[in-house]
UniProtKB/Swiss-Prot annotation:
InterPro entries, per the entry: Cell_div_ZipA (IPR011919), ZipA_FtsZ-bd_C (IPR007449), ZipA_FtsZ-bd_C_sf (IPR036765)
Lineage: Bacteria, Pseudomonadati, Pseudomonadota, Gammaproteobacteria, Alteromonadales
NCBIfam families recorded: septum_zipA
Subunit structure: Interacts with FtsZ via their C-terminal domains.
Species of the source: Shewanella sp. (strain MR-4)
Membrane topology: Single-pass type I membrane protein
Protein name: Cell division protein ZipA
Gene3D superfamilies tied to this protein: ZipA, C-terminal FtsZ-binding domain
Chain spans, region Disordered: 76-103, 121-145
Length: 346
């Protein structure tokens, strides 16, 4: 056992020494050799020594093979004397000769597009010039009535168009005056009689509908085992352009802003049938009721269409069901029945 340990120790030492030797040898091998140790160093050295001893070859201009010439030494205070220009007899002769004045030549501008010569059309008529003039006279006289008639037609058409425009403008002003309501404030003492007349006209228009003869009802009911929460109902009512008003219920007016006549309304299906907007978060109910009286203001069919679409939209928003006045599922037969009732009370 001890011999084995000794052998392993010796082998390990030999391996360590071999690794160290190989490392030093690798480092020495990777280091760049200096110029003196390189084999080309002696070559350059011999070339330099040979060049110093041998004379340099210079060309006719005094430059060697490398383009280097002899060193020139100049004095610091040497004045630079300008050289006189070389005499040139040709330049002297040119200076003596004076240029002759040249008259300006006017160049006519050429047109961009050359016009082709117009070919005169031959006159094949056998009549004399006097006959031609006599023939042209009646022709011109015959054309004058035609032009006069044409101008008269244009004048009549212009008058007709202006008259039609005046009539259309007058009709538009009358329609605009009928549609627009008087909003100007009174500036005279007769303001109270005017307001009384206006209120009487409105009351008379309200009395024209008479007593309601029929009521169209739609129920929006929660599904079985569920309730409709007031926190969900209130934003839905406002989105559908309902406004809280008379009888503590919500009404749909002619104007989306809540102005004008009431088209239809929404009430609570549970007695007493009212809403409290301040406590809608604590409010819950089984359902709500849409109702519209007949006759109504405006187009009854259009008003019912708006009410039906509002009920369907509310049912989709709060996951409820639309029922008819008898609390039966809304269907095509019920729709036809409601349309018949609307036509009967129109």
């Amino acid at each position: 056992m001890e011999d084995l340990q000794l052998v392993l120790f010796v082998l390990g030492a030999i391996a360590i020494v071999a690794v160290l030797v190989h490392g030093f040898w690798s480092i020495r091998r990777q280091q760049p050799k200096s110029l003196k140790d390189s084999p080309m160093g002696n070559f350059y050295k011999k070339q330099a020594e040979r060049g110093e001893g041998a004379p340099k070859r210079v060309d006719a201009d005094g430059f060697d093979a490398d383009g280097i010439g002899a060193v020139r030494v100049r004095k610091a205070n040497e004045a630079h004397t300008p050289e006189a220009p070389a005499f040139n007899p040709y330049l002297k002769q040119e200076a003596k000769t004076q240029p002759q004045p040249v008259e300006p030549v006017q160049v006519e501008p050429k047109p961009l597009f050359e016009q082709e010569p117009s070919m005169a059309q031959p006159d094949f008529s056998l009549q004399s010039p006097t006959a031609k003039e006599q023939h042209r006279g009646p022709k011109a006289s015959r054309q004058e009535p035609v032009l006069q008639g044409h101008s008269a037609n244009l004048a009549q058409a212009h008058v007709g168009q202006s008259h039609a425009a005046m009539v259309a403008q007058k009709v538009a002003e009358e329609q605009r005056a009928q549609v627009q309501m008087p909003t100007q404030t009174a500036l005279f003492d007769d303001e109270e009689p005017y307001e009384e007349e206006q209120s009487q006209a409105v009351e008379q228009a309200d009395d024209d509908l008479g007593e309601p003869r029929d009521v169209l009802v739609l129920h929006v009911v929660a599904k079985e085992g569920q309730q409709l929460n007031g926190a969900e109902l209130l934003p839905c009512f406002l989105t559908l352009n309902f406004k809280y008003g008379d009888m503590n219920i919500f009404h749909r007016h002619v104007d989306n802003a809540g102005n004008g006549k009431v088209l239809f309304s929404i009430a609570n299906m549970v007695k007493p049938g009212v809403f409290d907007p301040d406590n809608m978060e604590q409010f819950s109910t089984q359902g709500v009721v849409f109702f519209m009286t007949l006759p109504c203001y405006g187009d009854a069919l259009m008003n019912f269409s708006i009410m039906l679409n509002s009920a369907r939209q509310l049912a989709d928003d709060i996951d409820a069901v639309v029922l008819d006045g008898q609390r039966q599922p809304w269907g095509e037969f019920t729709k036809q029945d409601y349309l018949h009732r609307i036509r009967a009370n129109a």
